[in-house]
Every structure is written in C-alpha cells, then in structure tokens.
Amino acid sequence: MSGLDIAGRYHFIGIGGAGMSVVAELLASRGARVSGSDRADSPVLERLRGLGITVFAGHDPAHVPADAVVVVSTAIRESNPELAAARGRGQRVVHRSEALALAATGMRFVGVAGAHGKTTTSGMLAVALRSAGADPSVAVGGVVPQFGSGAHLGAGDVFVAEADESDGSFLNYSPSVEVVTNVEPDHLDRYGSREAFEAVFAEFASRLVPGGALVACAEDPGASRLASHARERGITTITYGRPGRCAQRPDAAIEDVDSTASGSTARVEWDGQAAVLRLAVAGEHNVLNATAALLAGAALGLGLPEMAAGLASFTGTARRFEERGRVGSRRLFDDYAHHPTEVAAALRQARVVAGAGGVTVVFQPHLYSRTRIFAARFAEALAAADHVVVTDVYAAREDPEPGVDSTLITSALPGSLHVPDMHEAARIGAGLVDEGGILITMGAGSITSCGADVLEFWRRGEAQ
C-alpha cells in the first residue's frame, strides 16, 4: 500500500467482478478518481456509471489514463491489452487487495476468511454492526439488501471485508479482528497440499495488529488447529461451535440449534454472557456464520445482546441461497456454492426449505483444477438432490485440462445429466421440477443467468 494516495487516480481492469466493483465504489466514495473496464456491459457496470464512475465495455489501451494506478485481480492475465499497455508505460500495477487496504485506511479492519462462508458472515457482521449503531464500511462479494450493494462507506471506524485466501492476497491486510470460518483445503492448484493451505492461514493470523483477536470455528479441524497455534503465540483467540462437534470444548458454545424453512434459532454462551440467535435464514451453517459475526462484534467491544438483535434483521446476500422467483408452487433459488462442502450445505438448506417438495440442481463446476481434484466429492454432495443437471466447466482464469470436464462428476453420479449448453440445461432442469418443488442454479461462474430461462419456461408451460 506504500505510496498510494486515497485521492489519486485508479483504473480497474475487470471492474465488473464482484470483488473489484466494491473496491472501486469504496475508493470513489473516499474521493479517488476511478475508472474501469470489463469484457462486456452488465448491470454492475450500469450501476457504477450511476455512481459517476467512468466504465467501459471491452478492453482497450486507450481506456487507461496515463496517470492512473492500475488495479487488477488474480483473474486478469498479463496478455490483457490494458494491462500490457500499462506495464509498457511503466505505470504502477497493484492487486485489488492493496486498493481495498487503502480504502480502509484509518479504520479498524475486520477480515473474514475461510474456504466458504465469507460473504454471508461478512454480511451478517455488517448488518448487525449497523443495527448496533457502529455504521461500518463494508466490502462484501454479494449484494447486502440493507446496503443495496456489496459496498458501503460508513461513518464509523470499523471496516468489514472478505479476506480472500485463494491467491494469498489476504496477507496484504493488517486486521484488528480476524474471523476464520474454516480452513478446509481449497485452491490446491496454487497451494499443493493441506499443510501449505493451513500455513498461509497461520501467516494471516500473524498479520493481526497488536491487541487484535482471532475468531475461529472449532468444528473445523483446520480452523481449530489454527486457533491452537495462535494461542501458543499469545494471540487473543475465541473459538466457537457446537460442543458435540468439536474436538475440544469451544470458548463460545452453541446450544439448542433449530432450523426450519422460515429461519434458525440457537443459544450462544461465551465469557459468562448468553445470547439467543433468531435468524431469518435457514440452515445450521448459518447459525455458525451468525455466531462468528456475534463474536467478532464482541471483539470490537459490542455486547452480545445488541449484536444478536441486529443479526435477526439479516435476510441474506445475493447468490447465497437467494430466492429468485416462483411460478405457481415451484420456486427458483440461486447459490454461489462451488466447493463440495458448500454444495452439501446448500442442499441441506434446500431440503429444509422444500419440505415435502423435490429438489433439482443445475450445477456449473468452477475451474478445471477444482473439478479434477473434487469430482468424486461433488458427486457425493450433489447426490442429496433428487435431480442433477451439470453444465460444462466454467474456466474463469484457467485453460482447459486434457481429460477434465463435467463428465468426471456425472459419471460418478448415476441419474445425473451432463448438458453443456446452459439454455438447454435450464429447459431440462425446469422440466424436472414438480409442483411444490424447488430448482437451484448453483456455481461461482455464469450459471445464475440460467435463472431467467427457468422462470420463462415455467411461465410458458414449455418445460418438458
């Protein structure tokens, strides 16, 4: 972050991405001159234009101001014409995490990390803090209804953000509070092994400012090991979980968990205090996420009861088991799940919500490397659905791998269908949903665009 000026000029390549757009919005809110580009126009670009940010559809060296610091994510390749031109001119290029750290200058930074659960936990924490009067600044990878965006510049001194472990960029932060929802191995194309993945989280914990606190889920073996090592190094640590599912009794015990289609309840006991969670979101995993947010608020100095009251108003974030529409008694949901554990959690939530109705999934695998590594586990997780349609792999930043495609999943899951074309996948998936059933479009890529097709097929009665 050295040498970056909050009032400077910044050009974001790939500004339409969830992580990039929120940072661009926050920097602009703090007085920076911001521009950006993305491959194609989108509602995100239109929203940024409405905020006064100059954005372009398509990449062209002419879009890059000569005096701008160029901001990129790991997804941007060196061959990108704007990036190549900026490097050729000797312009400074920084990662989005460095720009985010700049946007948080002067605030108490709360970094929420973990292979899954980051967006929901960050959103929960932000909503609860706002309800408690803290008015935090926020950088979340999904739209939070209370803020109308994934970005918010608050009047308070707290900054809540997702801390991305996928490329190690969370090491650019110096948090006052860290939340680690889990350390379940992912991104093994980068890290290579569980040990290396856990090591980068240990390094993340060492980035806490003096007097900072680590909040970690004791139900997850990796996060539990992280907490133990942090304690050994003298770091203030708060663990949480359901005692019967933890190797050691957690500091904050979650009891009396109940989840129904309309929400979840639980009791949390910590440090002689108790709070009752009454959540408007279903799923036991959301009880864990809410407890993490509750304790992060406590680490910032807020009381458990006021944090619990704020959590009751959280209704979800975009693409996290988000209801997108209904036709008759059939309902459509959309979920960002792209790791087997996330898929399993989403389908447990789906079963609660669907009740006696059926559950159909249209799943888009994300990354060839993840598909290769987790194909069998994806098949196992998806087996919880009644019907499964799998589209082609969404490549994102990767090139295709020989022998790696979606049939690695469907061949391990009898009765599932591989349908490469997303429109066709939507038609087939829609036709598998009976009255009272639900369909979930699932994945971290472009799969959400199938939703409109599903609803249209239902409306027209064209699903076969």
Where are these regions (language model features)?
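N-terminal leader/targeting and accessory segments in enzymes
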Residues: 1-99, 213, 221, 282
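Nucleotide phosphate-binding/pyrophosphate-handling subdomain across enzymes
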Residues: 2-11, 19, 23-30, 171, ...
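Conserved hydrophobic helix-helix packing surfaces used for dimerization/oligomerization
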Residues: 10-12, 70, 110, 158, ...
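Short internal beta-strands
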Residues: 32-39, 213-218, 360-364, 384-395
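Short glycine-dipeptide loop
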Residues: 208-214, 355-357, 435-436
